[in-house]
Regions:
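N-terminal glycine-/serine-/threonine-rich phosphate-binding loop
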Residues: 1-40
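Short, active-site-adjacent cap segments at secondary-structure transitions
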Residues: 18-19, 47-50
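Ubiquitous "structural anchor" signal
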Residues: 22-23, 52-54
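Glycine-rich N-terminal segment of FAD-binding domains in flavoprotein oxidoreductases
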Residues: 44
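Ligand-binding beta-strand-loop-alpha-helix segment within the catalytic cores
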Residues: 53-107
Length: 107
């Protein structure tokens, strides 16, 4: 049996960081850190989640649909984060994230 993968760091990058100028430098530093540590970046929802909140309230969307929309908002913010680091690779599952991290990149 394969031993479980061990992460060194799990970093949640909150969506509020997307409202200032610190996001690009932060992602560049995380990219450098990925060469030394196995890390996983989990995105918040940012302005994408804000839009989902407004639209679901306005349209009176049910909670399950609103939840799925919020998850897609996190995906959108994750794509933005990935675009800010040359050492980042977009992944959509844990196995892919492990492979990317083992290669010294940011999943």
């Amino acid at each position: 049996m394969t031993p479980p993968f061990r992460w060194d760091l799990l970093l949640k990058v909150g969506g509020s960081l997307g409202r200032g100028a610190a996001l690009a430098p932060l992602m560049q530093r995380i990219g450098l850190l990925a060469g030394r540590r196995r890390l996983l970046v989990v995105p918040g929802g940012g302005v994408f989640a804000d839009l989902v909140r407004r639209q679901t309230a306005r349209a009176r969307v049910d909670e399950e649909t609103a939840h799925h929309m919020a998850l897609f908002a996190m995906d959108q913010f994750g794509l933005l984060l990935s675009s800010l680091s040359r050492r980042s690779t977009v992944v959509d599952n844990l196995q892919a994230a492990e492979l990317v991290a083992e290669a010294g990149r940011v999943p």
